[in-house]
UniProtKB/Swiss-Prot annotation:
SMART domains: rADc. This is Ribosomal RNA small subunit methyltransferase A. The lineage of its organism: Bacteria, Bacillati, Bacillota, Bacilli, Bacillales. Keywords: Cytoplasm, Methyltransferase, RNA-binding, rRNA processing, S-adenosyl-L-methionine, Transferase. It comes from Staphylococcus carnosus (strain TM300). Gene3D superfamilies: Ribosomal RNA adenine dimethylase-like, domain 2, Vaccinia Virus protein VP39.
Length: 296
């Protein structure tokens, strides 16, 4: 990296002035201005000349330019039309970058991968995710039939800790279950808010999620499974039996059946959702077949 890199206060301010760019809080725009942090993200992603990269929210291209130097191809989704001419400028030296001016949650990511990254040996998502939609983005990408091998993503520290949380902790919840289901998760580093322009209100964290060859547990309907696990955390102070009364149709009239279903799965109805492992949740879900009265 050198003095011309985008991820410096001087270069970022110069670009802001050149394009008279104003940050939009509604889009969670906070541009990274520390080349050392970017290098650590690159190192953690293990990308090389055979790797295709999906980036979400490239901003002015501070991370994108470094991805382009190391990866075979980069596809970056940017929702803000105002940043497209900026990116055309900052990334003009790289013919292996495709910028798509679309909302990642509405874009046809499958088609984009087939069109631009089909000749890559592996695909990684490497991004400084917009904080306001971090969870929807991850859930959306994980649940699609995409050949993504892993993710190295920066996000709000609180959300990152939920992804990597252990059973029984305050951070452990439905998002922890989804992440654990699809990936092996680890923390890369904590990032202070001072290395962004403008600085966000909270510190950030970089998390690495590597896709499992197969989900850690077997369930026949992932959407319903995640709906069931989410309900277990709907009111964290309540027991799992009480939370599930709100999930099932006529649940309050089926207290005894819910209790029997839980006990049949080896779960004490007085336990709270945060004490159950993903394997225990999967066992409960698969055990629902024996209790046709319990529908949701």
């Amino acid at each position: 990296m050198n003095k011309k890199d985008i991820a410096t206060p001087t270069r970022t301010r110069a670009l802001l002035d050149k394009y008279q760019f104003d940050f939009k809080k509604s889009l969670g725009q906070n541009f990274l201005i520390d080349v050392n942090i970017i290098q650590k993200i690159i190192d953690a992603s293990n990308i090389d000349e055979r790797t295709g990269v999906i980036e979400v929210g490239p901003g002015m291209g501070s991370l994108t330019e470094q991805l382009a130097k190391h990866a075979k191809k980069v596809v970056a989704f940017e929702i803000d039309q105002r940043l497209i001419p900026v990116l055309e400028d900052t990334l003009s030296d790289y013919d292996n970058v495709t910028v798509i001016n679309e909302d990642i949650l509405k874009a046809d990511v499958v088609e984009a991968v087939q069109t631009h990254l089909s000749d890559c040996d592996k695909i990684m998502v490497v991004a400084n995710l917009p904080y306001y939609i971090t969870t929807p983005i991850l859930l959306n990408l994980m649940s699609k039939s995409l050949p993504i091998d892993g993710y190295v993503v920066m996000m709000q520290k609180e959300v990152g800790e939920r992804l990597n949380a252990e059973i029984g902790t305050k951070a452990y919840g439905s998002l922890s279950i989804v992440a654990q289901y699809y990936t092996e998760t680890s923390k890369v580093l904590t990032v202070p808010k001072t290395v962004f322009m403008p600085p966000p209100n909270v510190d950030s964290i970089v998390v690495k999620l590597m896709k499992r060859q197969a989900p850690i547990v077997a369930v026949d309907d992932e959407d319903q499974f995640f709906k069931m696990t989410k309900a277990a955390f709907s009111q964290r102070r309540k027991t799992i039996a009480n939370n599930y009364q709100s999930l099932f149709f006529d649940g309050k009239q089926k207290k005894y059946i819910i209790k029997t279903w839980l006990e049949d799965g080896g779960i004490d109805p007085r336990r709270r959702g945060e004490t159950l492992s993903i394997k225990e949740f999967a066992n409960l879900f698969n055990n629902l077949k024996k209790f046709p009265e319990l529908e949701f």
